[in-house]
Amino acid sequence: AMLLQAMKPVTPYEMGETEVPGMYTISIDGLGSKPVEYTVQLPPDYDPYRSYPCIVALHAEGKSPVDQIQWWCGNLNKRMNMRMGQAGRYGYVVIAPKWTRDGKTNYGFTVHEHAAVLLSLRDALKKFSIDSDRVFLSGHSEAGTAAWDIGLAHPDLWAGVIPIVATAEKYIGRYWQNGRQVPFYFVMGEMDGNQLEINSGEFNRYLQRTGFDTMIVEYRGRGHEHFQDEIHHLMRWMRAHRRAFTPEKFTCSTLRPWDNFFFWVEVDDLPEDSIVMPIMWPKQNVRDVEVVAEIVSDNRIRVKTAANKITIYFTPDMIDFEQRVSIYTNSSNTTKAIVPSTEVMLEDVRTRCDRFHPFWAKHEYSRSR
């Protein structure tokens, strides 16, 4: 694990001369045969032996990934031959995936859109030196809605989520419990139609219930805008937040088969009557699948969920590998030795691309049907 942390990125990107120093557009394999493209802007004097915080910035409808790079990093100063914006000043790597579907401008809550964002992040973790505990997700307008949804669906990935003029739609209301696990910073305008009314149900949950870290900023007399004047406050907020990688206790919900990894628990084979694909929305009388997990004292782990397959991953922060571990999964109880495995560790780094927090071992459980 220490060797993995000390390594440079696994497949460092060959950085040649570009028109804008430190900006590269990269194409990778997406789902199926469709490639995914993302643009990355590195901070000045980028050094692969250091680790940098990161912003995954999703562009609004009708905009491009470069527009998001410019929002966070500023325009190119031709005299200085560098961008002079806030992200570069604070040493952030900015990743801007081309997440929209061909011919579509609205966010569809689909697996392809999630994959475009998550695969871009994972590829960037392979190629660039990114601090995986300080990765923030942001988006404007429809992309703000996407950031809100993806942030709730995959709360284990983010140090914080920044939806700007976003709308609470579809799964966002059903995944509200997941919001306890990730900080949110919302920005909106008072005159932006009835956005506050639409979002008020979720905002009330986040502000009135315990365990949420939520900031909501409303600009008086302003409408549906990009709100770049908020960027200094955003930088201060991000500086104060880091991801909690192995929370001792969490409850998360899922309705989609690809929203199945939460911190140190992976679930598969969800009950058919609890799956709602985006094209089927709204589906009546559907109960989401809850994943309730807890690290208890004395080397005990508890996981309860309606999913039929559970994989629990372990790190030294969670258990003492020299002692036997008691694992409670649904109605099954077992006490066994959990042995660290190099194979598990390397496979985990290959798939999740998180060199700073590899899992050392895993335990698999399948419910008998």
Residue ranges of predicted features:
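A domain-start/cap signature at the N-terminus of enzymes
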Residues: 1-52, 333, 339-356
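Gly/Ser-rich "nucleophile elbow"/oxyanion-hole loop immediately N-terminal to the catalytic nucleophile
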Residues: 44-50, 104-141, 157
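The conserved beta1-alpha1 loop
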Residues: 53, 58-60, 165, 188, ...
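Active-site machinery of serine-nucleophile hydrolases
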Residues: 54, 58-126
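Primarily recognizes the serine-hydrolase "nucleophile elbow" in alpha/beta-hydrolase
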Residues: 125-126, 133-180
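Short beta-strand/loop motif that positions the catalytic acidic residue
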Residues: 179, 185-188
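C-terminal catalytic histidine-bearing segment of alpha/beta-hydrolase fold enzymes
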Residues: 193, 197-300, 305-309
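C-terminal beta-sandwich/jelly-roll accessory domains of carbohydrate-active enzymes
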Residues: 258-369
